[in-house]
Amino acid sequence: MSEDQDLGITQSKIHNTGEWYAEVVQKAELANYGPEGMSGFIVTRPRAYGLWERVQSYLDTRFKQTGVQNAYFPLFIPEGYLEREKEIVEGFDPEVAWVEQAGRNELEERLAVRPTSESIIAPYLSQWIRSYRDLPLRVNQWTSVVRWEATETKPFFRTKEFLWQEGHTAHATRADAWAETMLRLNQYESTYEDLLAIPVLQGAKPEHDKFPGADTTTTVEALMPDGKSVQGATSHYLGTEFADAFDITYTDTDETSRVAHTTSWGLSWRALGALIMTHSDNQGLVLPPTVAPEQVVIVPIWQTETKERVLEYAEDVANNLDDAGIRVELDDRDDQNPGFKFNEWELKGVPLRAEIGPDEATEGTVTLIHRPDGESITAERSEIVETVQEQFDAVYAKLYAAAEETLNSNIRIAETRSELLGTIGQHGGYVKTPWCGDEGCETAIKDEIAAEIVMVPISSDEDDEQDTTDENMGVNNDTTVESNEKSLDLTDSTCVVCDNPAFKTAYFAKSY
């Protein structure tokens, strides 16, 4: 096999999506699979970690602007801590990795390797909170968690260990905690839409699929080109259950002891999986300029007699872009031809290529090529910074528009069971259906076609009824605040599975 053949992508995104994805991840130098005997673990290479750092920077800035402070809590959680919240134990027990021995000595109490941190953070919130003056309290940690999932692993989508952030807050009232829940959900939506060029749907998880111990789990869902949904991030209103279990109380203005309302919210490197899957093509990785390690690659094209002049011009352009804060790479290697360089940088996903040959050097121009579609733009040297920045916006808009078209054209409605099964089987995507709210009806569809309810819409019907003083009333999954996804008209509707009256709109989809 020649070097050019080895460099390129050999699988088809449309026909062999799984193999194509794995090939892009490895050949674009994003990750390697872990050591033999450690199925489900990956080695994150610098290019992928750089993507994660840009996601981290984007979110961390917004968290801090809205009162969040970073902290770090232990990797290990005593078994007794987990057992204090029954639903956490039941929800995560099959996925928990346990430490039972240190050196040659058996531990007195097993330690869970962090699957999530509510049970180790809540006891400290209890210590730190004494009065209403200590509220709201907001902490976040950037860390990794381990969930020993039995399902097939896929780099960045499903791995036993993964990077994420998890935020945890405590509030005096249900209304404040719910506002926090939605604030973080909106920040996650912005991360996908304004940083990663991926449109998402906002909704809530059905009652049986919410986070263990949560009152309400909200979600942003992204649709991949193969018609499967990705849970992009979740934000949980935990009510008072965790606060009751861990004694998170505060003294109110009237000296009354009250139970706090808590939230937790997280986004993992699954966002990178969605980024890779959404935009990349059969030539390799495609990245928006917002997160690309190199936003522009300059490829000089010369003959022996023009080399010095072309390189001098290219270096001047590179310095100009670098001074403007643009991430630029000048590929002046002389052991590879321009065609090889074009293919290599396309594979690595650089959004904009600048070609500079003798003609450009003579005429005072730069030829700019868009990575997504190969569109060519001639830029004046004197306006190169402004033009490059304009082309960044153009590339981002192209990527978002393509992803938005995929999403909008793949939301369908089914009013019968046969329509639901046929639509998912033929098209994939999201199928909106009337649903009675019974988990058994979802299970029947899941058993037949491996599709599940990924979300139900959030509406504003009962938002005004949120009581800021009632500590025990939960938030209804369907009727809390406005969302960008609307319910079907369920007047006289029946569930597509059991024909009982329908009370909810369910979004069915296959998912990662």
From Swiss-Prot:
Its main location: cytoplasm. Keywords: Aminoacyl-tRNA synthetase, ATP-binding, Cytoplasm, Ligase, Nucleotide-binding, Protein biosynthesis. One of its GO terms (molecular function) is ATP binding. Its EC number is 6.1.1.15. InterPro entries: aa-tRNA-synt_IIb, aa-tRNA-synth_II, aa-tRNA-synth_II/BPL/LPL, Anticodon-bd, Anticodon-bd_dom_sf, Pro-tRNA-ligase_IIa, Pro-tRNA-ligase_IIa_arc-type, Pro-tRNA_ligase_II_C. Residues 460-484 are annotated as: Disordered. Transmembrane segments: none annotated. It is found in: Cytoplasm. Homodimer. Consists of three domains: the N-terminal catalytic domain, the anticodon-binding domain and the C-terminal extension. This is Proline--tRNA ligase. The lineage of its organism: Archaea, Methanobacteriati, Methanobacteriota, Stenosarchaea group, Halobacteria.
